[in-house]
């Protein structure tokens, strides 16, 4: 993160990365985007020097964007985030079924496989 001093850094508005950058990168020129896609487009077009996003999201973007020559660099840093989750209303008629299915996916290793495929 210290390497970003004096650099132009893009973030998505309203995200944990936006909050983190606002608090911790006072020496950087922060560029706030409405979407993470436009932040990455600015990086591809060399309009910014870096994008800050959570690791799984960054890795997913890179893996699923044809012709992207981006890569995740530097050490990961904690933005105070909790692990990823599935959020549904407790009033959803499939609430119990969804919870049971997620528990099965965790237990049988499917979530680990998906994470390795899309987020590493």
Predicted features by range, described:
Residues 1-120:
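Proline/Glycine/Serine-rich low-complexity intrinsically disordered segments
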């Amino acid at each position: 993160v210290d390497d970003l001093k004096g650099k132009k850094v893009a973030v998505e508005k309203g995200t944990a990365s936006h909050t983190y950058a606002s608090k911790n990168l006072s020496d950087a020129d922060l560029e706030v985007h409405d979407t993470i896609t436009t932040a990455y487009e600015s990086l591809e077009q060399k309009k910014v020097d870096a994008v800050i996003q959570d690791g799984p999201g960054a890795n997913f973007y890179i893996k699923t964007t044809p012709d992207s020559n981006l890569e995740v660099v530097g050490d990961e840093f904690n933005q105070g985030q909790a692990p990823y989750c599935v959020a549904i209303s407790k009033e959803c008629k499939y609430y119990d079924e969804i919870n049971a299915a997620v528990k099965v996916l965790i237990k049988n290793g499917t979530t680990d496989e998906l994470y390795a495929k899309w987020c590493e």
